[in-house]
Structures are given as structure tokens and as C-alpha cells.
Amino acid sequence: MSNKAKKISWTAALVAAGLYAAPAASEVRLMSYNIHHCAGADKRVDVRRVAEAISREKPDFVGLNEVDQCALRSHGIDMPEELGRLTGLHATFAQAIPLQGGGYGNAVLSREKPLSVLRVPLPGREPRVLLLCEFADFWFGTAHFALQETNRLETVEIIRRVVNEKAASKPMFITGDWNCQPESAPIASLRTFMAIISNEKCRTFHGFKKHAPDTVSCIDYIAVDRGAAARVKVKESHVTPDEMTSDHNPIVVTIDLTKGPGHLH
């Protein structure tokens, strides 16, 4: 009997004996949302309205951009804490800049409490930040790219270094408002080490304006590092049209994540 045949026979025996487990998959619902500091089309800051928009999607992990924390323009509300309370999720905040007595940046809402948190400064005329949270099975985070192309290209290279360093042992999902279209140079560069799993053919940014149905402005994304892409099966991906709550639409991806190779118990 060849070595290959022996290996197949041994694996079959383990399966029959209940000692070998096939890779387990778990369903995870991911969301990305630029919330425009909870200021809607009516210019009213309404945290509850944003929380309801999030809760309707029933996400497990949410990356939020343009989040105020205790800033004067949003009535001193600690938005990460309040959104966490209203959605029943853990809240983690990373400040990009100080703002009116408080801060402004990104947040992650999560069903699980993070094991660790990484904050990485990103370039821009207005400084930006990458927020990454480590969980039991993967990293999840969000980045808000700058408006300038050169800064966006620099940001992609910073993210590449982080992925190379941190994604060796766990998959890494990065979401966010990246301020560039799918055919842009920064996205082309990012695709060399990340696989975009969100819908790229739907409008994610509307700017509180009506648009022709055949025009698309996709600048918000959900992606996974290419090293883990084979372990991710996209079950469903959509963008929810909402021209009241924020100037961006929420984007959602439901995946099956294979936790790892078969193993002996």
C-alpha cells in the first residue's frame, strides 16, 4: 500500500471512530458603516436612530467610521459607549483627532469582548486611524482612508505591514470607508494581499442626495486577508439603502468561517 493510500485509510479509520473532526465552520455577520457622527439628513444628531439601523441588520461585528466621543457638536455624547449600550454589543473606540473637547475616530462594536486592541495612525491632512480588535478566531477592524490619493496609497502599505505581521496566526477582516472606487490604484494595490468580500456594485455613499439608479459610488468595503480567504465562504452580501440616517449606506456580509484544519480530540 502506498503512503498516500495509508494516509487516506488512516483518516477514514479516525473518522469512523469519531476521533477526527472535519474543519468546523461558524456563521458570522460583518458590517461596515460610516455614521457621519450620527447626524442625519435632517442635520439632527440621533444616536438611537443609528443604533436602530445597526440592530436591524443583526450584525456580530461592526466597523464604524466618523464617530464622535464627547464632542461639543454632538452634545457631549459618548457615541461608542451609547451605541454599544443600545445595540447590546461591546464598544471599542480609537481616536484619530481631538475634537471640541472630545475625540473623533473609529469604533468597533462586537458580540465578543476583544482580547487585545491595536491602534495604528494613518496619514492624511486630517489624521486617520486603523482600529483592530483581536478576538478568539480572528482580527476585526476598521480604517477610514484620507481624501488624498497619495495618503491612501501610503495607508495601503501600512495595512500591508500590519496584515503581514498579525494575520499569520488568525484571519484578519478590515472594513471601512476607504474613499476610493473599486477600480482605483489604492484598491488595486490592496487586492494583492486582501480579498474584498462585500458587494462592490452597489452605492455605499449618497451624500444625502438623490442619484440615478445606474450610477454607483462604492467607497466602503469589507475585506479579509488573502491568506485566510479560502476559509471564508460568503453566504450573502448587501448594501441597505438609507438616505436619512447617514450620508453612507450600511454594508453587510454574512460568511461561514472555517475555524481551522481537522484535528485529533
Where would I find each of the regions flagged by the language model?
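Structural recognition of the beta-strand scaffold that forms the well-ordered cores
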Residues: 31-32, 61-65, 108, 132, ...
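Surface-exposed cleft-lining segments at the edges of enzyme active sites
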Residues: 37-39, 118-119, 143-149
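Metal-dependent phosphoester-hydrolase catalytic domains
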Residues: 119, 150-151, 157, 161-173, ...
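Structured beta-strand-rich core segments of catalytic domains in phosphoester-bond hydrolases
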Residues: 27, 42-43, 67-139, 231-241
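N-terminal, active-site-proximal structural segment of metallo-dependent hydrolase catalytic domains
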Residues: 2-14, 18-86, 98-102, 158, ...
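Active-site metal-binding loops of divalent metal-dependent hydrolases
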Residues: 33-35, 67, 143-145, 176-178, ...
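Sec-exported extracytoplasmic/periplasmic mature domains
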Residues: 55-59, 84-88, 92, 114, ...
